[in-house]
Amino acid sequence: SNTPAFYNFMNYADFGIGTFQPPNGFHDLVNAMVDLGKSLGVKYKVNHGLSKINVKNKKVENIVINGKSTDCDLILSGADYHHTESLLPIKSRQYNNKYWKSRVFAPSSLLFYVGFNKKLKNVQHHNLIFDTDFNKHAEEIYDSPKWPTDPLFYANFTSKTNSKTAPDGSENAFFLIPIAIDLIDNKETRDKYFEKIIKKMELY
């Protein structure tokens, strides 16, 4: 299989080490990082779109945020490498579009956040629903990119270990289907795959 080796680390984290979460979800982690930054003098701009990185003499001169230029001394980007490069002038980019088109990217994903008004007895916090051919699904991600014929997926029920994430007698969940990148996406397709997931979850 052409599945990236990184997934071995993910499996080891799940089954070898175990996974953890903040009591109130990962929003707690974000808030803690923001509070720490503010204590060190960091100023945050949220809901601001960065559309361009301007370069002069091989050095970043300024960035364009919400249509306005802002001077800066240093840029540290946590975004995807390809996306960050797309904000630079073409002559300042390390790789061209031909290079990126030749790369094998990690999968994208289709995510559903779902609430159940009943308890599901046969699921745990982490669930890998791999009830069909793994190799076929992998081929439909990497070799012949298309929407999976019979998707494998990951199901996460935080309410199994943290009752605060759902009302009494209910469950909180999200479902993740690994998919190829650059697929045509629309509501009809999403609805179709949601139905596929729900039909499988009815067995639990």
Label the model's feature ranges:
Residues 13-21, 109, 178-186:
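Glycine- and acidic
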